[in-house]
Amino acid sequence: MKISLTNRVRTTIRERKLFREGNRLVLVALSGGADSVALLCVLRELGYETVAAHCNFHLRGVESDEDAAFVEGLCRDLDVPLHRIDFDTVRYARERSISIEMAARELRYEWFGLLRKELAIEYVAVAHHADDNAETMVLNLCRGTGISGLCGMPYKRNDGIVRPLLDATRDEIEAYLLDQKITYRTDSSNEDTRFRRNLVRHRIMPLLKELNPSLQEALLRTRENLEGVAAFFSKATEDFHNTLRATASISIREVKETPAPFTLLYDLLHPYGFNRDQIREVVTSLDNPPGASFFSSSHRLLRERDRLTVLPLSPKMEVPELFGLKIGDSFLDLPDGKQLSWQRGTPADLDLEGLRLPNTKLLLPLAFVESLQEELGVRRPQRGDHIHPYGMKGCKTVSRFFIDRHVPRRRREEAWLLCQGTEVVWIMGYAADRRFAIDELSDTEEYLLFSFEL
């Protein structure tokens, strides 16, 4: 017997303990699309008192305003209190050199948090469903992820975000709306495959379903299996986390006695801002003499005689300042008088001479730069920086790269790095990271050509 959407959501709320017992007031993120409209209606059916929150990101011209008008009308008809806000999403993304998708996400969740406190509402219900979660699992797999990433979206977050539709499929949601004769808005940008999620939805998922027509069920089983693994792993590492929180250090001997020191240390140190390459170097240091230090943006890790100690950075130990890039500009003046400049255009528009060895020039796809989820910026080197040098095999620290190239210490200290978050993209004037290299140019695609002279 096919379960109704309302009963499915009721079961999810009960089994996943989404709401504290006795709490019937919920803030619903209401875009006007099928998923959020169904979520609002189902929660009302289940007896929850709902308040709606609508974001107008002004990304689709008149369509965005029509969405807002639809939401206002729906809430008026249902007698649901509505709070709405307008965002200049494009400007926000440009100022922070992040993708439109990431900008909208940051703006949305920041406002939800503020509104939740203002209205004294404990939970914010968002309308992600099972198909969204399957797409997230595939996206995370393509990016490279761990157990939690392969589990997809959590049903409940610590900041009050809950996902009551996460066990329901898109087909079930649309069937419910059709049966109840409920209208909704359709977002035309959902068909735009320039956005990564849409690319996965419209191209990759159909191909995967050719391999396995029961892909949705297979991914659900995978998620359930991995949730069990994640719970088991969390329990196994609980003592290490408690010790690190209580003493700011952990025993090197105990780490080395575990079957997977890197996996353990990644789980322990990633929350402090250390990246995978740094943590690999930490693992290597376990078999070396004490004294090594590693830096994240907020913490310092010391390899002492028998312990690893994690300390917050003091003002005297600040990591190098990051100078953010605004892609809409054409240059960045650096404090030492040097300048990083860039041009935008197709290959025919750009002077690509000398690009074969990317020392003073670097070429990146414009779409890639715009889609970066972390800030692209320029800073000085810091301990633990790694690079996969273009034209070479393997990975090495930036300091080892300079030593191998016989670069004088003064020149090393004066070097500049182009970075995406914690990843080194380019030792400016020396070498690019091959992971960001372009294998084949497209005559029609736009690129950014960066130039820097030592």
From Swiss-Prot:
It holds the Pfam family TilS_C. GO terms for molecular function: ATP binding; tRNA(Ile)-lysidine synthase activity. It is an enzyme of class 6 (ligase). Keywords: ATP-binding, Cytoplasm, Ligase, Nucleotide-binding, tRNA processing. ATP binds at residues 31-36. It catalyses: cytidine(34) in tRNA(Ile2) + L-lysine + ATP = lysidine(34) in tRNA(Ile2) + AMP + diphosphate + H(+). One of its GO terms (cellular component) is cytoplasm. Its EC number is 6.3.4.19. It is found in: Cytoplasm. Gene3D superfamilies: HUPs. Transmembrane segments: none annotated. InterPro entries: Lysidine-tRNA-synth_C (IPR012796), Rossmann-like_a/b/a_fold (IPR014729), TilS/TtcA_N (IPR011063), tRNA_Ile_lys_synt (IPR012094), tRNA_Ile_lys_synt_N (IPR012795). Belongs to the tRNA(Ile)-lysidine synthase family. NCBIfam families: lysidine_TilS_C, lysidine_TilS_N. Ligates lysine onto the cytidine present at position 34 of the AUA codon-specific tRNA(Ile) that contains the anticodon CAU, in an ATP-dependent manner. Cytidine is converted to lysidine, thus changing the amino acid specificity of the tRNA from methionine to isoleucine. The N-terminal region contains the highly conserved SGGXDS motif, predicted to be a P-loop motif involved in ATP binding. This is tRNA(Ile)-lysidine synthase. It comes from Porphyromonas gingivalis (strain ATCC 33277 / DSM 20709 / CIP 103683 / JCM 12257 / NCTC 11834 / 2561).
